[in-house]
Amino acid sequence: MQWRALVLGLVLLRLGLHGVLWLVFGLGPSMGFYQRFPLSFGFQRLRSPDGPASPTSGPVGRPGGVSGPSWLQPPGTGAAQSPRKAPRRPGPGMCGPANWGYVLGGRGRGPDEYEKRYSGAFPPQLRAQMRDLARGMFVFGYDNYMAHAFPQDELNPIHCRGRGPDRGDPSNLNINDVLGNYSLTLVDALDTLAIMGNSSEFQKAVKLVINTVSFDKDSTVQVFEATIRVLGSLLSAHRIITDSKQPFGDMTIKDYDNELLYMAHDLAVRLLPAFENTKTGIPYPRVNLKTGVPPDTNNETCTAGAGSLLVEFGILSRLLGDSTFEWVARRAVKALWNLRSNDTGLLGNVVNIQTGHWVGKQSGLGAGLDSFYEYLLKSYILFGEKEDLEMFNAAYQSIQNYLRRGREACNEGEGDPPLYVNVNMFSGQLMNTWIDSLQAFFPGLQVLIGDVEDAICLHAFYYAIWKRYGALPERYNWQLQAPDVLFYPLRPELVESTYLLYQATKNPFYLHVGMDILQSLEKYTKVKCGYATLHHVIDKSTEDRMESFFLSETCKYLYLLFDEDNPVHKSGTRYMFTTEGHIVSVDEHLRELPWKEFFSEEGGQDQGGKSVHRPKPHELKVINSSSNCNRVPDERRYSLPLKSIYMRQIDQMVGLI
């Protein structure tokens, strides 16, 4: 009996030890028992790209003196001179090696919880339900705007009334930059109505725009916002109406005489004064639609605002056969491009349009720069101008060299997951430890160039933040694992990247992500007459504003994510979305210049005096069909896009678990 008691005692002792270890390593992190990496170091531990790491930095007991995630460390010596494919060897970071997730309970919780939740088929019935929910979300917001706000620009969804420019406070740029007293929400939503197949409402809305909207207004608006929201929507709707194939149903307008195109031209002419009297060719940020550039206007503008006009202005020029609009937009892009750093190839985020001096030296992927990169690539896709692709490729390489942190590969190896940080444009040194919600567009852009693996990892990071808060805070500090700016104005960028990643991989994981986003929006932002901005992502208090991009982008991308049979996917026409989510068909018509030569003062030459080769439409077709993007590998369909250990690692790094 004694030996039985001894054996029983040993068994109980072993079970007790297992229980203690499980509490420490399993529950510990979720209960906050471990020391999170952001609290263990400060900015004084940052080193210059050429400086050695401090051998004593970092928490006591950490092997190798690792002080935190490799995001805080500059790229390895020589990284700025070599492409991303060169191996990076960052420190393991607080998240440790690749099998760290297993140590913290990955195997001990039975079948993997990520596999359980996300992998496998997404039932067709559930998909249809989510599609209808997305459509209902749009209809609820749109109908309430028409009932309570039209013809004003926006809907105040809590008090069920309209909102226009703030005439009492001209300095209220958050409102006045966007609202021009031209029924903004109605105009911005036109092509969403078409994509959802609502021909009767689309036709009614177009007639309302033609009959009631005028740009002869004493409104001072931001050139960028008026271009992407209004000009882009008018051009998109015009192309839908005049498309001989009518893939979305009968969207034709009886006796339509190109009125939307003429309205787009009228608006663009009113924006042209922004490009006059600037010593650099970079436009003023704002114009008055009646009088032109205000006399007391600011000479400083952001790179994205000045350099993201080429798609809309280029489409307008090519439809009208008038090179003026594309010329001024392209001149601005070239002027900004020529101001990039000679050392890093990076651009800043704020520039003086008269001196060309960089006022804001931060280089990142978020506010102030985001759509500049986006439109370099999309301009090439639409117009086939080779120089646009060359600029984009050079910019993308600089981004990889100086902004990207973390391990080399998304889905293998040790170290922290990839992240793109904000750096000084001249030195490449880290400037701060936050990212903003606009940066969530970048995985979608990476999909367009075929860098799907990196897109998967970056998207997973933003999705982890969404899971933690049920929204994306406007600015999130990855060092402190907390929001720096707490509001969420119903932005679409994460949804956009989710949609594009699903199109690239057909992985049901992204349908689950879309469902999470839909349910969060319904739970936290739906109010009496629409969907409201979240004032505070933690306490979920709301603000009385529904921005127009909620209907033009957020609802549209959610709907398309779940509508597998939508003509966007099945009609055989290739479509591209503008930075405001307006749909544009990619066809040879836009790749043919209706004028003899462009930039005539350059004589058809580049700055080096060499003749510029413009690929012909048939050459572009070969170039653009040479990738394997149309073939989805089976492993992308039936397994998680990111290994569970890396998903868990990312969730840990944002404080989710």
Curated annotation (Swiss-Prot):
Cytoplasmic side stretches: 1-4
Transmembrane segments: 5-25
Keyword Ribonucleoprotein: no
InterPro entries according to UniProt: 6hp_glycosidase-like_sf (IPR012341), EDEM1/2/3 (IPR044674), Glyco_hydro_47 (IPR001382), Seven-hairpin_glycosidases (IPR036026)
Residues in the Lumenal compartment per record: 26-657
A GO CC term assigned to this protein in UniProt: endoplasmic reticulum quality control compartment
Glycosylation sites: 181, 198, 299, 342, 624
Keyword field: Endoplasmic reticulum, Glycoprotein, Membrane, Signal-anchor, Transmembrane, Transmembrane helix, Unfolded protein response
Gene3D superfamilies: 1.50.10.10
Disordered: annotated segments: 48-94
SUPFAM superfamilies in alphabetical order: Seven-hairpin glycosidases
Protein's cellular compartments: Endoplasmic reticulum membrane
Record-level GO BP terms: carbohydrate metabolic process; endoplasmic reticulum mannose trimming; ERAD pathway; mannoprotein catabolic process; positive regulation of retrograde protein transport, ER to cytosol; protein targeting to ER; response to unfolded protein; ubiquitin-dependent protein catabolic process
GO molecular function, one term: calcium ion binding
Effect seen on changing residue 225 to Q: Normal affinity for misfolded glycoproteins, but impaired SEL1L binding
Membrane topology designation: Single-pass type II membrane protein
Chain's role: Extracts misfolded glycoproteins, but not glycoproteins undergoing productive folding, from the calnexin cycle. It is directly involved in endoplasmic reticulum-associated degradation (ERAD) and targets misfolded glycoproteins for degradation in an N-glycan-independent manner, probably by forming a complex with SEL1L. It has low mannosidase activity, catalyzing mannose trimming from Man8GlcNAc2 to Man7GlcNAc2.
Family that this chain belongs to: Belongs to the glycosyl hydrolase 47 family.
Subunit structure: Interacts with DNAJC10. Interacts with DERL2 and DERL3. Binds to SEL1L.
Protein name from the UniProt record: ER degradation-enhancing alpha-mannosidase-like protein 1
Organism of this sequence: Homo sapiens (Human)
